[in-house]
Amino acid sequence: MSRALRCVGVLVALVLAPRAGRPQGVAGQVGIDADVIGQAIAITSLQNLAFGTVLKGVSTTVLPTAAGAGEWQVQGAKNAQVIIAFTLPAQLVNVQALPGSAMPISFTPTSARWNRATNDVTGATAFDPVAGTTGRFGPPANPYLYLWIGGTVIPAATAKPGIYTGAIIVSVVYL
């Protein structure tokens, strides 16, 4: 065999020989999923949670079925299921007194309600706003979800007079 042919044979053998640290032709695959939604979620605040005039040392409760309950209208994709979650304050701050004047606020396991498609709290489903819940938008003609929240304020006997405020944040995301 000629020397050139032998060099080519050795070169081919070196190229085809497995090498340490290099992949040996293993392949894999994954599936791809995409869930396209037809509509973004829009939240409209309809009413603030309002306790009205509160007496020092006397706790006051507003039920989610009461006229002073906080209320939202949520619009989204027809019949879509969602997760409803709240970020709740532990206290309300007096905006007229010296800094540090606060009043506790609490929420029970039945302080919130939701209703599919209908703005009627009497037929709404109660849930714990601390834990959140799942809900569902209405059918094509009425793709809405309505939310209500109540709570209890507990002013101390030494509470400073003034207006106490806080914020309740509601989050709604598709499942």
Task: Please provide the spans of the model-predicted regions.
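N-terminal small/polar-rich segments of proteins
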Residues: R22-A102, T134-L175
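Intrinsically disordered, low-complexity regions enriched in serine, threonine, proline
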Residues: R3, L16-R19
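Bacterial N-terminal signal peptides that target proteins for export
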Residues: M1-G9
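Terminal beta-strand-rich extracellular "head" domains
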Residues: N94-R136
